[in-house]
Amino acid sequence: RPSKVKLAPEEVVITDRDEELINKVLKWLEDNVADAEITVDQLAAYVGMGRTSMYNKIKGLTGKSPVELIQAFRLEKATFYLKSGQFSVSETSYKVGFSDPGYFSRSFKKHFGMSPADYIKENKA
């Protein structure tokens, strides 16, 4: 199931083309989430836009840069694996494209306000 991306600011009117772009970005992220080497250039090529145009469009629609969006998607996806109880924090970090479990844990804590281990404790299935 795709992760939710919070769109901001609320005043932004989203056209069908914008929604199509966001859905395409989310599909690409879903398909490539485990790849630690994905780049913004690859995403731009996939959606058929130049890097700068895509940056401006994604930033305008989501309030996040493409890099921030990729990271947020990975961290949201990690919650799915952590909640399942089937994967350790390290295994989860690799499944969502982090090559360094320590960096994953720090990023997770910064994003959610708690460590992955605490998240697991609070969300036992």
Predicted feature residues:
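Non-catalytic interaction/regulatory modules that flank or connect domains
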Residues: N32, A36-M49, S53-N56
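A short, Lys/Arg-enriched amphipathic alpha-helix from helix-turn-helix/homeodomain DNA-binding modules
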Residues: E11-E37, E68-F87
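Terminal helix-turn-helix DNA-binding modules in bacterial transcription factors
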Residues: G60-S99, K121-A125
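…primarily DNA-binding HTH/wHTH and HhH modules…
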Residues: R106-A125
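Short hydrophobic/aromatic patch on the recognition helix
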Residues: M54, I58, Y103-F104, F108
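The C-terminal output helix
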Residues: R1-S3
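Residues within helix-turn-helix
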Residues: D41, T52, S88-E91, P101-G102, ...
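Residues within the alpha-helical elements of helix-turn-helix
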Residues: Y46, K95-V96, H111
